[in-house]
């Protein structure tokens, strides 16, 4: 029971006091159910308002997608697990910062949240935990913060409308990603880290893009993209129409001029000619 000392010191006069809120710690309850909560001011007489308090199972977390995001925050992520439904004030805690969460069913219990800013410009992993009442939290997953990437060079910077061009993007802060993507204008394609070179990403040019310059950006989690503003030019497939001369000695050394149709070769970035399996440098004139 609880006691309060109210009024004057000697009882000669009294002052009416009104209590508007009580704080207490919920007791253990073996069954997962809703119970009525009443209060008493004298250990005997209880209210009869039948306010409801729900006992819930402890949440269990399985996956977080994406599992990385920008240090600037705003990454939308989903937490999949069990016993995530029915919270009165569901929150997700990343390190020491909490954000509101909303429950949805996506093949199972799922909580949606938005990652808060990290507050420092560094790559780091933080613990992720969930509380259905904004007080008790349980966790077990990690979320990685990365520094926003920057693209400094695109090679080659042109490609055929047929697609398939292997494009190398050079820059900085490409490490710490979970879902690598390249974006040509509004079109996304998968990307991968170039072997042991952490400042190089590789991606294939998608087919049938409009024949026009398009901004090329990268993402480390499939959501937030760089804003470097470098351009990639898509061109029509060149069709050779004539060779002059069309023959030469086996020793090589013949200067060959090729006429083409269907493409503006002046926008090219890397000019090459291939004789059977032999590739040689070429110049545009």
Segments the model singles out, each with a brief description of its role:
Residues 2-29:
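Ligand-recognition surfaces built from glycine- and aromatic
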Residues 29-33, 116-123, 207-212:
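Surface-exposed, short loops/turns at beta-strand junctions within beta-sandwich domains
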Residues 30-31, 36, 44-88, 134-178, ...:
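Beta-strand/beta-sandwich contexts
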Residues 38-40, 129-131, 219:
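Conserved Ser/Thr-centered positions that define the repeating blades of beta-propeller domains
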Residues 50, 97-105, 139-140, 187-195, ...:
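Short, surface-exposed loop motifs enriched in S/T, G, D/E and P with embedded aromatic residues
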Residues 77, 108-116, 169-170, 198-206, ...:
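A generic structural motif
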């Amino acid at each position: 029971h609880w006691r309060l000392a109210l009024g004057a010191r000697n009882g000669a006069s009294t002052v009416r006091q009104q209590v508007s809120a009580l704080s207490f710690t919920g007791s253990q309850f073996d069954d997962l159910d809703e119970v009525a909560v009443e209060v008493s001011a004298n250990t005997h007489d209880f209210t009869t308002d039948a306010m409801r308090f729900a006992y819930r199972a402890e949440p269990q977390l399985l996956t977080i997608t994406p599992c990385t995001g920008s240090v600037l925050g705003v990454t939308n992520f989903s937490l999949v697990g069990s016993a995530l439904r029915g919270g009165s004030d569901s929150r997700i805690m990343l390190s020491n910062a909490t954000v509101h969460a909303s429950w949805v069913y996506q093949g199972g219990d799922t909580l949606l949240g938005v990652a808060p800013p990290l507050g420092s410009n560094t790559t780091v992993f933080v613990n992720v935990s969930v509380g259905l009442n904004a007080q008790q939290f349980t966790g077990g997953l990690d979320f990685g913060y990365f520094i926003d990437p920057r693209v400094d060079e695109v090679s080659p910077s042109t490609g055929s409308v047929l697609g398939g061009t292997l494009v190398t993007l050079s820059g900085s802060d490409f490490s710490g990603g979970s879902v690598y993507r390249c974006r040509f204008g509004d079109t996304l394609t998968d990307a991968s880290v170039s072997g042991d070179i952490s400042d190089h990403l590789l991606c294939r040019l998608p087919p049938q893009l409009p024949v026009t310059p398009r901004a090329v950006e990268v993402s480390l989690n499939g959501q937030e993209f760089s804003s470097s503003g470098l351009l990639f030019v898509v061109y029509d497939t060149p069709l050779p129409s004539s060779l002059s001369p069309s023959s030469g000695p086996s020793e090589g050394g013949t200067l060959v001029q090729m006429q083409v149709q269907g493409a503006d070769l002046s926008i090219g970035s890397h000019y090459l000619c291939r004789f059977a399996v032999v590739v040689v440098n070429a110049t545009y004139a």
